[in-house]
Amino acid sequence: MTQLSSNDVPSMGRRQFMNLLTFGTATGVALGALYPVANYFMPLRAGGGGGGTSAKDELGNPVTKTGWLATHQAGDRSLVQGLKGDPTYLIVNEGGEIGEFGLNAICTHLGCVVPWDSGANKFICPCHGSQYDTNGKVVRGPAPLSLALAHVDIEDDAVLVKQWSETDFRTNENPWWA
């Protein structure tokens, strides 16, 4: 058996450093991979005790009631970023106030964003022609289901979008999206 010279054997300090570097790198990668999973199950909430998500405009700024009503008239249906970042329609009712519900703008057929057609007074999907009435109820397929509902609340002038889990008032059935 041959003996290695002391120059060929790495010092304990260098070995410990390499072990620490390897462990630190592996830990960093593992924690980085777990962050999106943890964020999915425990999403960040908007300020306030209600637990809603702050509606955001096309620039990512929080929507306020006074700012929204200053630029949107009665009957308007315009997109904001709502729950889970999905495009959501805020509805200004005929009384000039923001409605108590919003509509998720994702078509229930293939997931296209459904634009509001003010001339036809309904939502018409550009992908396959599904149509939804003013409240998001499907009136013409191939979409099988109505647009998902979301609660819209005003807290200190901030517009909050919250999960809808009650009976769907359009169909009197349990919500398919909850």
Swiss-Prot record:
Its cofactor is [2Fe-2S] cluster. It is found in: Cellular thylakoid membrane. InterPro entries: Cyt_b6_f_Rieske, Rieske_2Fe-2S, Rieske_2Fe-2S_sf, Rieske_Fe-S_prot, Rieske_Fe-S_prot_C, TAT_signal. Disulfide bonds join 112-127. PROSITE patterns: RIESKE (PS51296), TAT (PS51318). GO terms for molecular function: 2 iron, 2 sulfur cluster binding; electron transporter, transferring electrons within cytochrome b6/f complex of photosystem II activity; metal ion binding; monooxygenase activity; oxidoreductase activity, acting on paired donors, with incorporation or reduction of molecular oxygen; plastoquinol--plastocyanin reductase activity. The chain crosses the membrane at residues 20-42. The keyword Isomerase does not apply. Residues 65-161 form the Rieske domain. The keyword Transport applies. Keywords: 2Fe-2S, Disulfide bond, Electron transport, Iron, Iron-sulfur, Membrane, Metal-binding, Thylakoid, Translocase, Transmembrane, Transmembrane helix, Transport. [2Fe-2S] cluster binds at residues 107, 109, 125, 128. It is an enzyme of class 7 (translocase). It catalyses: 2 oxidized [plastocyanin] + a plastoquinol + 2 H(+)(in) = 2 reduced [plastocyanin] + a plastoquinone + 4 H(+)(out). Binds 1 [2Fe-2S] cluster per subunit. Its EC number is 7.1.1.6. It comes from the Bacteria. PANTHER family: CYTOCHROME B-C1 COMPLEX SUBUNIT RIESKE, MITOCHONDRIAL (PTHR10134). The 4 large subunits of the cytochrome b6-f complex are cytochrome b6, subunit IV (17 kDa polypeptide, PetD), cytochrome f and the Rieske protein, while the 4 small subunits are PetG, PetL, PetM and PetN. The complex functions as a dimer. Component of the cytochrome b6-f complex, which mediates electron transfer between photosystem II (PSII) and photosystem I (PSI), cyclic electron flow around PSI, and state transitions. Belongs to the Rieske iron-sulfur protein family. The Rieske iron-sulfur protein is a high potential 2Fe-2S protein. This is Cytochrome b6-f complex iron-sulfur subunit. It comes from Prochlorococcus marinus (strain MIT 9312). The lineage of its organism: Bacteria, Bacillati, Cyanobacteriota, Cyanophyceae, Synechococcales.
